[in-house]
């Protein structure tokens, strides 16, 4: 179901301490919070943003459909989506 560039996966492991394997496991085990259209469809037509929960923090995983597979492009933590979906930083 998922595919990715192994070089990018190694870079994510080194720089962000997360892997596409872990992301796929999280998605398959119910950790997917939302799927959004990429806000810049002109530059990234058809690309989606998968919002996932990693240890209580929202991560954004840009992805695109390739046939019957989903290509994971990168992953990064997002304060904006953590606040929106997980309520971190709420004073109430």
Language model features with spans:
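Ribonuclease/tRNase effector modules and their secretory precursors
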Residues: 1-92
């Amino acid at each position: 179901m998922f595919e990715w560039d192994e070089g990018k996966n190694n870079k994510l492991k080194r720089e962000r301490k997360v892997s596409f394997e872990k992301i796929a496991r999280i998605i398959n085990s119910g950790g997917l919070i939302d799927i959004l259209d990429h806000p810049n469809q002109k530059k990234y037509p058809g690309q989606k943003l998968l919002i996932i929960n990693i240890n209580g923090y929202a991560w954004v995983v840009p992805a695109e459909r390739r046939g019957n597979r989903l290509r994971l492009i990168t992953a990064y933590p997002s304060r904006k989506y953590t606040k929106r979906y997980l309520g971190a930083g709420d004073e109430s």
